[in-house]
Amino acid sequence: MLTLSTIDMLLAINEGQLIEEVIITLLASPQLAVFFEKHPRLKKALLKDIYQWKKSLQEKVKETLVPTIIADEFALYQQTQSLCNAVFNQQVDNILTELNQLDSSFVIEATQLIKTNKPFSPAQQALFIQRWRISLIFQVTTLHKALFEQEQEQLLAELQERLALSGSLSNTFSENERAAGRLWDMSKGVITKTPYDEKIIQRYSDFLNQQPELHKLASLLGRSKTAKSLPEESVIFESITIVEKAPDTTPEQVNGIGLSDDILRLLPAELALLGINEVEYEFYRKLIEKQLNTYRLQGDSWQERTVLRPVTHHLDEERPRGPFIICIDTSGSMGGFNEQCAKAFGLALMKIALADNRACHVMLFSTEMIHYQLSSSDGLQELVKFLNQTFRGGTDLASCLNEVADKLNTPTWKDADAVVISDFVAQRLPENLINKIKKVQQQQHNRFHAVTLSNYGKPSIMKIFDHIWRFDTGLKSRLLRRWRQ
């Protein structure tokens, strides 16, 4: 069967220009114009999808089959093209009959051309073929427009849904252009959307804004750049310049008697030889041979000298910002206000992850573990599920940390920061687990953060963490924070 893409090529139809017109028409729609004015950051993210739209339309053209009537007419057109002038004049009436049978739009014009020009000269035959080609191009272009209008309506409907969702959440997630782009990408994964989904995200976003200290704490943790020091003895010798005292010829004091030709420092006995005629020539011989007895004067000077010595280096490398693994305690003691704080803190870290293009994985732990990948293509759906999760059950912190340690040994998460949000009222950790975590910290330099929502966390548990961030959720602290606001 003949496809639209094939007939475009055979008729030399500019398929790319037709697709370009569809995209321009789509972007000029009033709905998009209003949205772009309101959310300029999301506009840039949306425009990045243009290439994918074009590619999708091209694939659709390749897959769409030409109707049988047009395909048969095109086959007849190709046969007629190859006829010589004499044969064409013999078969032109049969060609007209077949065009009538195919109900071709070219029939009326073909009939007029035959009446006017029969028998056809070679030039008139070429005109007939050319007019027929124009008729076929018009029919195929009409097919394109019908197909593209249908695709445009579907694409616009999808865009309107994504725009509505992204627009409602832009104040929550569009911290920068990268975050806006990630939000736009995730909106594609939302197949079904209800007002309740947006409402719960907005509710926790509002709660986070009402707790500026919690928001600041999340920002400090998420943006922290802890340096890792790797002391290492260097086997390389480095050159250094030292200043030392060394003998010099600068005349400072008499240091003895020597042989030279320095007349200014002659001993009186040598000078006496010059006044005796018999030994005058002996004086000149000693002068030439530098054998005259003279005073030796010498001083000290400070001189620079380069020496080599071994040096010990301490390499301080800035810790790269890796993904987040957020572990949230969902035990019964974490209910109520603690639950709100934990979920809002997770939302804040997700916002930072989107802005910094980092992965964000949430693990809820109590007697069982539930995983949510908040930075995936369906991250918004995962976020809604996470925020709807209820907190109940016991606290199995050991199983959670064991799974985190295993996850940090995988290539995807080897540079991740582990964040545990809990009241840390739990059982003691096994010694083998503590050693396992220390090994990960020492060998891979992963950071373990503890966000404690209570003042009653066990010190034996807290000591395994690199950083401890405290946010007291007690009634007294809550009232003090509200009073400060």
Curated annotation (Swiss-Prot):
Source organism superkingdom: Bacteria
GO CC entries: cytosol
InterPro entries, per the entry: Uncharacterised_CoxE, Uncharacterised_ViaA, VWF_A, vWFA_dom_sf
SMART domains in the record: VWA
Pfam families attached to this UniProt entry: VWA_CoxE (PF05762)
UniProt keyword terms in alphabetical order: Chaperone, Cytoplasm
Subcellular localization: Cytoplasm
Function: Component of the RavA-ViaA chaperone complex, which may act on the membrane to optimize the function of some of the respiratory chains. ViaA stimulates the ATPase activity of RavA.
Family according to the record: Belongs to the ViaA family.
Family annotation (HAMAP family): ViaA
Subunit structure comment from the entry: Homodimer. Interacts with RavA.
PANTHER family in UniProt: PROTEIN VIAA
Name recorded for this polypeptide: Regulatory protein ViaA
